Amino acid sequence: EAVLSYAEAHKWRTGGNPARWRGHLSAILPSPQKLKDRKHHSALPYSELPQFMGILSKTDGMGARALEMTILTATRTKESLGAKWSEIDLDNRVWTIPKERMKAGIEHRIPLSSQAMKILSQMAEHKMSDYVFPNRSNGKPMSNAGMSSVLKRLEHNDITVHGFRSTFRDYVAEKTNTPERTAEAALAHKLKDASEAAYQRGDL
């Protein structure tokens, strides 16, 4: 844009600047800032997930259990590490994350699988605070480094914890007939259609 404006100012070209952003390209292209802020997290191919989960289930430590829970529930790191016993209904096998802890600001309900329930049972045996995965020194949530260190121990420096959400999304899209709307709801993503989102009241 600057180069063409310079040429136009020196009358080396005429007809306006086709690369002008304001009032021109801004009307048809996404904001450069949005593209700059968008990050892609390295993910494990879903074909390798069964083997990975088998190894992870045999790995000791709270970090390993937290990572398992994060993968099984397709939650964000902060959501899983901040999980409280008061949010979990063991009888009905549902984990309800309050809107205050959700990125989209909307309460998120997650049905708990048998594997997730097993992890909760293991953590309940060593319960020391209201947090499911507490820092043993102060009772607060364990740090993000806990799960990342597990990946390093398992020699998976090439992937990130957040990347497992992409693994989940890829599997659902390529191996199931699950509607996109349901998959997005499982990831607690906001509906793209603002009018539809305004009337959204249920879990799906």
Question: What are these language model-derived features?
Answer:
Residues 43-50, 92, 101, 111-159, ...:
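Active-site/catalytic core of tyrosine-dependent DNA strand-transfer enzymes
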Residues 6, 10, 153, 171, ...:
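Active-site catalytic microenvironments for nucleophilic, acid-base chemistry
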Residues 96-105, 117, 139, 174-177, ...:
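Catalytic-site neighborhood detector that most strongly recognizes the C-terminal catalytic loop/helix
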Residues 1-7, 112:
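Non-catalytic DNA-binding core/recognition domains of DNA-processing enzymes
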Residues 62-68, 72-79, 142, 146, ...:
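C-terminal catalytic core of tyrosine-transesterase DNA break-rejoin enzymes
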Residues 9-83, 91, 102-106, 126-127, ...:
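Basic, Lys/Arg- and aromatic-enriched nucleic-acid-binding interface segment
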